[in-house]
């Protein structure tokens, strides 16, 4: 009887979805990240999670001329699942919902947005790769950042 109860409990636990990610679970993204290639540079700076939010800033340019900037924010959506809010050039934010994450990666999606529809971050040690793409992975563009 005890074995049957243990087996039933194990089956129930295996069938349960893991708890949803929290903003605090994305703290591995925090820091100052830089990418330099052929005179073009991009920086992303992420504050550590605090008060259930992460704030970020991205800027890029050539040599000493800034060409683009973007305000970034990760906070819980209405359902509690983290949402990545991107405000390119300071415009109104576009939301991307967290759809997958683990200890070193996070994928955010918004299938209704023109481009990008997917934003993915993957960290390995002091490197982090950010990739934007269409929802099917096409038209992908990636930046490999180093922690500074």
Could you describe each region identified by the protein language model?
Residues 2-7:
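Sec-dependent signal peptide recognition
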Residues 20-21, 118-119, 132:
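Short helix-to-loop capping/linker segments positioned immediately adjacent to catalytic or ligand/cofactor-binding
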Residues 98, 103, 123-129, 133-148:
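Edge beta-strand at a domain terminus
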Residues 107-127:
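Short cationic/low-complexity microdomains
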Residues 41, 116, 140:
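Short coil/loop residues immediately preceding or within conserved phosphate-binding loops
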Residues 8, 12-22:
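Bacterial Sec-dependent signal peptides at the C-terminal "C-region" and cleavage site
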Residues 18-32:
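N-terminal helix-cap/turn-to-beta initiation motif at the start of protein domains
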Residues 30, 35-112:
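Central antiparallel beta-sheet cores of small beta-barrel/beta-sandwich binding domains
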């Amino acid at each position: 009887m005890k074995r049957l109860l243990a087996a039933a409990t194990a089956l129930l636990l295996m069938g349960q979805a893991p708890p949803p990610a929290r903003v605090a679970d994305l703290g591995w993204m925090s820091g100052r990240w830089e990418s330099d290639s052929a005179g073009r540079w991009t920086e992303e700076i992420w504050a550590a999670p605090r008060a259930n939010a992460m704030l970020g800033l991205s800027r890029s340019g050539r040599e000493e001329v800034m060409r683009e900037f973007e305000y970034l924010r990760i906070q819980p959506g209405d359902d509690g699942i983290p949402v990545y809010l991107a405000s390119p050039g300071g415009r109104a934010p576009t939301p991307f919902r967290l759809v997958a994450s683990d200890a070193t990666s996070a994928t955010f999606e918004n299938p209704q947005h023109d481009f990008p529809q997917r934003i993915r971050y993957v960290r390995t040690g002091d490197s982090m790769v950010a990739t934007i793409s269409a929802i099917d992975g096409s038209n992908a563009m990636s930046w490999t950042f180093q922690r500074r």
